[in-house]
Amino acid sequence: MSAAAPAGARGGGRLLVDGPAGALEVQVDCPAAARTGVAVVGHPHPLYGGSLDNKVAHILARAAGDLDLPAVRFNFRGVGRSEGAFDRGRGEADDMAAVAAWARARFPGPLLLAGFSFGAWVAWRLHPALAPRALALVAPPVSLYDFGRPAEAACPWLVVQGGDDEVVDAAAVRAWAEARDPAPALAWLEGAGHFFHGRLNAVRAAVREAWREALA
């Protein structure tokens, strides 16, 4: 049985934390009897309405909560109350690194990293430096951004992909995932679109079970 998070770390809500380009807005969701560790979640593209309130980002946080694990969603620079301006993924990686460092200091223990769409790209690029216990990529836009570095995953990982994604090339995601070594667990949701309308519980279940195994 996992130890509980330190008493001073419990609680949650909307906060501002220091980031590389100014303040970053974070949402902390912390169960009352949280275990040690934390999940950090990256949202979809900042220029197309992506924010920490995105429903897929929210469902990723709920998957962590199902395991009594605190979750931290955050707004990339220039979104919501986060300061700065869109930086084509470079500064956004710095934002995620800063939030992960803050989250780890607040909630010591294993780090679980997740991202949806643009946030999945940022998480993929950054995860070797963060050394998470596990990584979850939801609808990673492999045909839109360079997923060549890193070449391989540095931890156990999961890819969740909708078969009818209207934004991301689903076949390209499958081919990319299957070409990795080690390959990820692949949760293929036939008929699901990019935003997983009507399939959010399936996303939640896939991530929850992958993370449960990683934490065992």
Feature-to-residue mapping (PLM):
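Catalytic histidine neighborhood in serine/cysteine hydrolases
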Residues: 179-195
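Primarily recognizes the serine-hydrolase "nucleophile elbow" in alpha/beta-hydrolase
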Residues: 94-155
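Short alpha-helix in the alpha/beta-hydrolase fold that links the catalytic acid
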Residues: 169-178
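Catalytic histidine-centered segment of alpha/beta-hydrolase-like enzymes
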Residues: 192-204
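Active-site nucleophile loop of the alpha/beta-hydrolase fold
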Residues: 44-45, 137-146, 162, 192
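Short beta-strand/loop motif that positions the catalytic acidic residue
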Residues: 153, 158-161, 165
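Serine-hydrolase catalytic machinery in alpha/beta-hydrolase-like enzymes
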Residues: 19, 23-106
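Acidic catalytic loop of the alpha/beta-hydrolase fold
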Residues: 163-168, 194-195
